[in-house]
Amino acid sequence: MLNKDSTIVVTGAAGFIGSCMVSYLNRQGFENLILVDEFDDDEKELNLLHKKYLVRVEREDFFDWVQREKPAVHFVFHLGARTDTTEFDYAIHQHLNVEYSQKIWNYCTINNIPLVYASSAATYGEGELGYHDDHEIIEQLHP
């Protein structure tokens, strides 16, 4: 059971969805957040403005960091993935969306940490059919 002192990891924390999750968690009183992302973009910096958290960890450093620091993590929201449907480099998708997600899952499984994983691009694709969750159009949606 989570309480306000629980430590929560949010991957993709500087992106649109991840930063909204950080805002939501802050509003619920959670501030012991470990933010994981690639923090090299000024727009992402704006997404984190006024957010409360413990530390930011670069995505590629995260597993070395947890091995070294051994934080007591109570929950992981894995929202970090390459969702850009115009990215055609398969190796990037393979690394970020498959291999990295598997490493997150393994980390959580080994350490008995609850995990929530979500990605919207697989449903909405480039958005040519809109961004509706109406069940009538679900069959037409694809990445």
Where are these regions (language model features)?
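Catalytic helix-loop patch of NAD(P)-dependent Rossmann-fold dehydrogenases
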Residues: H95, E99, K103, I110, ...
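N-terminal Rossmann NAD(P)H-binding glycine-rich loop of SDR-like oxidoreductase domains
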Residues: I8-Q28
